[in-house]
Every structure is written in C-alpha cells, then in structure tokens.
C-alpha cells in the first residue's frame, strides 16, 4: 500500500510569490507536544533568478552561526535545491515577522561586516565541500536582497 503524501512546497504556486520573503510553511507537534516550525526563507524570485552554489554555500554557513546568535531555537537552515532560499526549522512558535527581522539583520552583517575569517566550517575537516565557497558572492547577494527588502508576506510586499 502506498501512502498518499502531499509536499507543501510543491503545492505552492511559485509564480505568485514575491521574493524576498519569509513564509511560515507549517507548525508540527511531536509525540510529547514539542512544536517545530518550518519557514520558507525565499531570497530570490523563483524561476527568475538563483544564487550560484558557492555563494549560497557561504551564506548557509554564515546563517548557521548568525541566526543562532540572534534567536533561540534554531534546528537547521538548509538551502533549497533550486537555490532560491532556505528552509529554516525552529523549535517553538515564531512569527514570520520575527524570522524576517533575524534574516534581515543576518544578511546586513554578511553584506557589511563579515570577513573570510568569520565564515565557519571552511576547512577539509569541517565541511564536505570546503573548496566551494565564495564570500564575495555571498556579500553581493546579501546586499541585493537587503536593497529589495524582506517581506513577512509571500504574496504582497510587506517589507519589515
């Protein structure tokens, strides 16, 4: 017997969203009542742009550190295969607005304050593809995204 599965992100109409934005995908509860929230952190417009792998990889490593410095409860921040943004998985209840503020602040630091020495996990021992990083691209993308503004609504521009 095959279990019917609906993957929410494949049900989203990618032609009507307006990136950059943060969107709450789902809230789920574990067997003991623990809440996990899953966010769509969309940095570039789907099917119109994508962040090249090395820049996205560096943003990923930086967000792993910067988000945790700004908010408690981060489980993981993983890039979408389409390279337009990230899934952000959090313990507890968080609003799209709060997450958008954290992402904005993190990207501002990437754009203006980060040096190569600040990028975590860039050695053979600490990264599975340590040669595939590009801080220049990460900084350029971060600034482009900040300049557009990050919305807490995926369908209308409500920039925070």
UniProtKB/Swiss-Prot annotation:
InterPro entries: LuxS_sf, Metalloenz_LuxS/M16, S-ribosylhomocysteinase. GO terms for biological process: quorum sensing. Gene3D superfamilies: S-ribosylhomocysteinase (LuxS). Binds 1 Fe cation per subunit. It catalyses: S-(5-deoxy-D-ribos-5-yl)-L-homocysteine = (S)-4,5-dihydroxypentane-2,3-dione + L-homocysteine. Keywords: Autoinducer synthesis, Iron, Lyase, Metal-binding, Quorum sensing. The keyword Iron applies. Its cofactor is Fe cation. GO terms for molecular function: iron ion binding; S-ribosylhomocysteine lyase activity. The keyword Transferase does not apply. Its EC number is 4.4.1.21. Fe cation binds at residues 57, 61, 127. It comes from the Bacteria. Belongs to the LuxS family. Homodimer. NCBIfam families: PRK02260.2-5, PRK02260.3-1. Involved in the synthesis of autoinducer 2 (AI-2) which is secreted by bacteria and is used to communicate both the cell density and the metabolic potential of the environment. The regulation of gene expression in response to changes in cell density is called quorum sensing. Catalyzes the transformation of S-ribosylhomocysteine (RHC) to homocysteine (HC) and 4,5-dihydroxy-2,3-pentadione (DPD). This is S-ribosylhomocysteine lyase. It comes from Streptococcus pyogenes serotype M4 (strain MGAS10750).
